[in-house]
Amino acid sequence: MQNDILLKAKELFLNHGFKSVTMDDLAKELGISKKTIYQFYSDKTALVSAVTDHLFEHISTGISCICDGEKNPIEEMFAIKEFSRSALQDEKSSPHYQLQRYYPKIFAVLVRKQFQTMQNCTQDNIKRGIEMGIYRSDIDLEFITRMFFAGFNAVRHEELFPSDHFNKSKLFNLHLAYHLRGIATPKGLEIIDKITAKS
């Protein structure tokens, strides 16, 4: 039952936002009483924390599996983007913004964990890309890594890119293209063009 609650809460939070979904909504969706939910989660904050932890672990594991594969660094970045988009269900509402606004402590912990994971993954990706000649060798690794992470969070910022004006999926595509085309060599650009031509 606890896993059912967690998975349904994740679905509702991603579709409608962390603030918008109430414990009553969750209980109704599951066909159970709120008392049953409180047997596993002391309050909504505890549930939000559990959902964000679950999402983070799921996405981190998926990204690790992609990085352990045989893709070249550019293909790897496109695969990670698609996996993350799918795992977040295209962020149909603005869960990132609501989490930041209404659960700032949980958000701060999540951002720290995300940065550590993305920093390691991105730096390894760039190093391999340089070795293969598809990324420029004059890249400032620390700067580019942090800029990529900053951009990843910026495109999810509701005030900068409001959902009623910008398509989140398109924003992720634009952000990745901005990142890769800025660091790619002519050889790397050929790979990017081939991948984007298929999509």
Please tell me what each predicted stretch does.
Residues 4, 8, 12-46, 50:
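Helix-turn-helix
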Residues 50, 64-91, 145-148:
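Hydrophobic alpha-helical connector segments
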Residues 53-60:
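Short, basic, alpha-helical segments at the C-terminal edge of helix-turn-helix-like DNA-binding modules
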Residues 66, 95-99, 159-162:
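Secondary-structure edge/capping motif, primarily at the C-terminal ends of alpha-helices
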Residues 75, 113, 131-147, 165-170, ...:
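All-alpha amphipathic helical-bundle segments outside canonical DNA-binding/catalytic cores
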Residues 89-124, 131-135, 143:
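Short secondary-structure transition hinges
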Residues 124-128, 132, 165-199:
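C-terminal peripheral helix-coil segments that are non-catalytic and often amphipathic
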